[in-house]
Amino acid sequence: MDIIFKDLINLWGKPVNKEKIDLNLPIGSISTDTRTIEKGNFFVPLVGKNFDGHNFLNMAFDIGVQGAIVSKEFNGSIPAGLPHWVVSDTLDAYQQIALLHRRNLNLPVIAVTGSVGKTTTRELIRGVLSSLGEIVSSTENENNEIGVPKTLLRGMGSDAAFVLEMGMRGLGQIECLSRISEPDIAVITNVGQAHIGI
């Protein structure tokens, strides 16, 4: 990860417990899941209908994360020594980090969407481009507001390109995913009636 802590200050201001970190060091790999988190990672607790990642802040701290993002709506326990930024929305912050990483890498981004055929088209493009080097591509469930940033954050400077799949579950979602990823090339497989009711 090429993002340093000072970059996060440019996004959200100074963190709580700023003295605990060297602002010129990389923030480490981004993790949203304490089941796979490792020492030196940066923790982003996401919130859903049936879960709240903030409940695992203490576990993440015990594992040895370098820092975290915390929603201003969270009223629970935050480890006393944890460097963290307080933000309005942790998902939005996660997306901002992914966009910053995408811009730093400056790799070509190809986005694929459409009523049908997205996954097949994505895999065909990935296969064609594979002769150029490593292609970072969406997996089956990485085509939404959480998955697209996750794919972008997997990218490295040695990679050749991103091929992203973008699904739509609501009005404005493709616009949101496009803002996160800033695609250089957009592929629309077709436009049918699959999402008329959304």
Mark where each language-model region is.
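Phosphate-binding loop of NTP-binding sites
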Residues: 12, 93-198
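N-terminal leader/targeting and accessory segments in enzymes
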Residues: 1-96
